């Protein structure tokens, strides 16, 4: 987005970024993020794991609400007033938006809010669409890594302030509820709670060893000890049951379609 050679196109891109609440010079990095995101390198990362909402009448009566979502300014009060419903307690919640991304345009939206349940049971394609409808995108694994830097690499989970890595609780917690689970840039729950989809794909691994003596975080990059024949989209951070395998270096791959739409996988968006 930043490597555009036409001055006219670069200006248009900058204006669009500014309209979405993220600002910066026409051909340079972003310098300000919406209130629901944190600065991370040259872009913005959502502060919280995504809460996916279905907005009724998104192009008519609720066009203003959709615009607030896209600007990163929609509050829980705004969403409730607009009749937006939260999705993600089962795979069926997202229908008619399908696991391969059909019928998702102008249907589901990803918001970054504190103290709500993050949405799970979502495929990579659905997460991609929810971000796109919200004028955002899935982050790359490299972008995710920058935003996660400084997050605690868990030991035991005390069940209150530590990252939600279990394995004793075994359920996701409300976004931002674990006050000690915050990165150097101010993003919450990047370790534990839900695994998070990122944009990158790799052949899915057959096992997930650690990083040797460097870290005990889960390491499932293709070729670690073997890979399967089906493609996988990368997930980061570990989940609510991962224990010491969770951490800012935790990486695995999962089927991007309905097979990967599990109760332990969510996502967050970037700009």
Predicted regions located by residue number:
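Short aromatic-cysteine micro-motif
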Residues: 32-157, 162-188
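Bacterial N-terminal signal peptides that target proteins for export
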Residues: 1-9
